[in-house]
């Protein structure tokens, strides 16, 4: 059992056309790791320099265990995320409509997941190309309004980490009603926690919000 949490923060895309470039692969989990404990020097080395935490730990203590994250925990999270975007993101779109993040008419869906994660795209390079094309179109005249799964971006060197690739779980695109033109996107982070009767701790929510803040910082 698990308690899902899908949280969002927004950024105006009306004038955002900045191109991003970089070379490192899939660093989403490094952002999660960094936010979990930003004050820890060993964690900082691991996340920023892309060194496995186990290697950092064994540098300090050669007897440190070699086991990584639980395969069961990873499978649980992957299964939950897949259920959200199944059948054209039926469950996710219904949830976004229910809470008012999207209007009923904003119901389009794009799936930028790679085949390794159960998606239709061949690799990260294809995901990056499609994601960048979408963002540029949103700054122009695109009429896409709805949900994007696994928007994938190259992060320029020096923005937050060395050159890296960022995969955002969920992006919602809606009309910019305040300005009457263009679009606003909201970045969402999908989390799974052990079942606590629907309760999610404030610290877990705070970490997720901090992580989404990094995503918003990376987008403009």
Descriptions of predicted regions:
Residues 23-26, 101, 207:
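Alpha-helical protein-protein interaction elements
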């Amino acid at each position: 059992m698990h308690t899902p949490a899908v949280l969002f923060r927004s950024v105006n895309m009306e004038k955002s056309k900045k191109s991003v470039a970089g070379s490192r692969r899939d660093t989403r989990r490094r952002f999660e790791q960094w936010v979990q404990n930003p004050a820890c020097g060993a964690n900082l080395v691991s996340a920023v320099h892309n060194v496995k935490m186990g290697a950092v730990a064994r540098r300090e203590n050669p007897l440190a265990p070699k086991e990584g994250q639980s395969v069961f925990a990873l499978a649980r999270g992957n299964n939950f995320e897949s259920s959200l975007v199944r059948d054209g993101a039926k469950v996710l779109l219904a949830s976004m409509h229910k809470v008012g993040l999207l209007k009923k008419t904003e119901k389009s869906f794009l799936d930028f997941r790679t085949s390794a994660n159960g998606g239709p795209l061949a690799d990260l390079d294809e995901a990056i190309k499609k994601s960048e094309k979408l963002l540029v179109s949103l700054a122009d005249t695109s009429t896409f309004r709805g949900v994007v799964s696994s928007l994938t971006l190259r992060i320029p060197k020096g923005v937050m980490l060395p050159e890296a690739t960022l995969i955002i779980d969920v992006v919602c695109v809606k009309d910019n009603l305040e300005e009457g033109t263009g679009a606003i996107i909201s970045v969402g982070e999908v989390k799974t926690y052990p079942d606590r009767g629907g309760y999610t701790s404030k610290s877990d929510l705070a970490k997720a919000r901090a992580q989404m803040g990094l995503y918003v910082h990376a987008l403009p």
